[in-house]
């Protein structure tokens, strides 16, 4: 089969646009794709919530990839061990109360489980602000969405209007 670059471009644009349009209104918007964001995305999506996670960097997982000083092992205590094992990450006891896990296995598993549960992950997007709606009573004032732009726009300090999503 001869490769058709236009079909590739069309596929990327259409599929991303479908995903983006589907996430203009979500139940939960998570800012940050580090370990906490990925775990939250998994548990919320697994319970049937419509979840979108936004990460400003190219890669998700935060600093977990690098473990300690780029030795790609992480150390967790009992609570972290339980979460990792619940998501399918192998842990090993080290000393009393300390457990280790492979940082690459942990990061990729958290990401895979979040996506598998239905969370949508948008990388290279920065959050510029939140959308707040006030009502007559101060108790009812709440955050209802996010103001989002491409990370490249932020880094280049370009004056480009952002887009919004509601949650």
What function would you assign to each model-found segment?
Residues 43, 59, 72-94:
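Conserved FAD-binding subdomain of flavin-dependent enzymes
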Residues 29, 45-65:
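Glycine-rich FAD pyrophosphate-binding loop
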Residues 4-6, 22, 57-80:
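Conserved N-terminal glycine-rich FAD pyrophosphate-binding loop of Rossmann-like flavoproteins
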Residues 49, 89, 119:
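Short phosphate-binding/catalytic loops that engage adenosine nucleotides
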């Amino acid at each position: 089969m001869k490769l058709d670059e236009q079909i590739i471009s069309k596929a990327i644009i259409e599929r991303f646009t479908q995903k983006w349009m589907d996430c203009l209104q979500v139940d939960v918007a998570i800012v940050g794709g580090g370990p906490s964001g990925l775990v939250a995305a998994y548990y919320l999506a697994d319970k049937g919530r419509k979840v979108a996670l936004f990460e400003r960097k190219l890669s998700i997982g935060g600093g977990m990839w690098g473990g300690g000083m780029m030795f790609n092992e992480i150390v967790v205590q009992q609570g972290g061990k339980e979460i990792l094992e619940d998501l399918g990450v192998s842990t090993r006891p080290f000393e009393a109360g300390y457990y280790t896990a492979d940082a690459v296995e942990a990061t990729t598993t958290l990401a895979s489980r979040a996506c598998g549960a239905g969370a949508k992950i948008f990388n290279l997007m920065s959050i510029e602000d939140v959308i707040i709606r006030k009502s007559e009573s101060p108790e009812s004032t709440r955050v209802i969405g996010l103001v989002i732009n491409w990370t490249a726009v932020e880094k280049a300090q370009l004056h480009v209007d952002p887009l919004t999503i509601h949650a």
